[in-house]
């Protein structure tokens, strides 16, 4: 797993950030899902193969998966919420997420079957073979893909879009799977205010990653003090040359940006001076070896006037 994958997964595993993502996606920023309503779930999913030729089980690992419990009309409502982070377009994402969701449903049925077989109640034959009772219900699974690219998602967003047929008479009999997709490119600048955690700040930086200046950052209070973890993630996923040497747990993004640019300019000047010095030393050595002027110029990039001045000094 790469550095970006590791860092984004750790950041999204934070319950505060996780809640913020789904409150934005499901409720347009309304604070419905709370940290206390979440429970960590095992991100490992195993799908048992079917058929006589079946061999090894399929094992997949989700990025983040949590159980959401809420009360609605005096009864408990359960949702399984999963997040998949992508730094680039995954052109098979609808099938990939469909598999994750199917394995989550399969696991629920398998767990129900185990509990019934351990229980004392004798089930009717059909329910016993199914491992599932007629009145049983599954917990819904919602998987959200989050893009960390400033570019628009140019892949399929549904299973039907991936199929090699566009005949509606056929497609109406083919089950579809729609991708839940959150991309910074498609978020209006004013909608980043709907995020209550710093995750919105991360996505806004991703959206403007290719901008030539920082005007989009000016005048926004949230950029004046972000946690070091958030600043580090922004630097990782955007490639911004941020200077995070400032002490303390809070980073002023505007200062970090400006200091990073100044440091880059100074480093470039220093490197330019060092490179010029190296070229001069090479030219002096080649002059002493009586190398032709044309060869010296080609290797060092120095002008003919530079070489005349060097020769006069030797």
Outline where the language-model segments fall.
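Accessory alpha/beta interaction modules
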Residues: 1-193
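Short, charged alpha-helical interaction segments and adjacent helix-coil junctions
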Residues: 77-87, 182, 197-314
């Amino acid at each position: 797993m790469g550095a970006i994958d590791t860092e984004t997964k750790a950041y999204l595993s934070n319950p505060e950030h996780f809640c913020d993502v789904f409150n934005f996606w499901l409720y347009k920023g309304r604070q419905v899902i709370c940290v206390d309503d979440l429970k960590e779930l095992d991100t490992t999913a195993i799908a048992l193969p079917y058929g006589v030729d079946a061999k090894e089980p399929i094992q997949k690992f989700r990025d983040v998966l949590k159980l959401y419990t809420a009360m609605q009309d005096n009864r408990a409502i359960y949702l399984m919420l999963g997040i998949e982070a992508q730094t680039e377009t995954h052109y098979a994402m609808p099938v990939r997420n469909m598999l994750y969701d199917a394995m989550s449903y399969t696991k629920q049925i398998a767990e129900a079957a185990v509990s019934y077989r351990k229980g004392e109640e004798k089930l009717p034959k059909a329910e016993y073979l199914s491992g599932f009772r007629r009145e049983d219900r599954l917990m819904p699974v919602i998987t959200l893909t989050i893009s960390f690219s400033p570019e628009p998602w140019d892949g399929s967003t549904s299973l039907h879009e991936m199929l090699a047929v566009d005949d509606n008479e056929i497609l109406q009999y083919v089950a579809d799977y729609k991708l839940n997709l959150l991309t910074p490119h498609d978020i209006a600048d004013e909608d980043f205010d709907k995020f209550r955690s710093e995750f919105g700040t991360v996505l806004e930086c991703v959206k403007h990653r290719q901008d030539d200046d920082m005007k989009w950052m000016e005048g926004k209070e949230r950029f004046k003090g972000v946690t070091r973890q958030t600043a580090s993630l922004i630097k990782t996923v955007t490639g911004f040359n941020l200077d995070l040497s400032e002490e303390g747990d809070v980073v002023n993004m505007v200062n970090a940006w400006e200091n990073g640019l100044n440091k880059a300019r100074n480093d470039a000047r220093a490197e330019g001076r060092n490179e010029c010095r190296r070229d001069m030393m090479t030219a002096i050595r080649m002059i002493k070896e009586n190398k032709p002027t044309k060869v010296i110029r080609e290797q060092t990039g120095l002008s003919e006037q530079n070489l005349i001045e060097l020769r006069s000094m030797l």
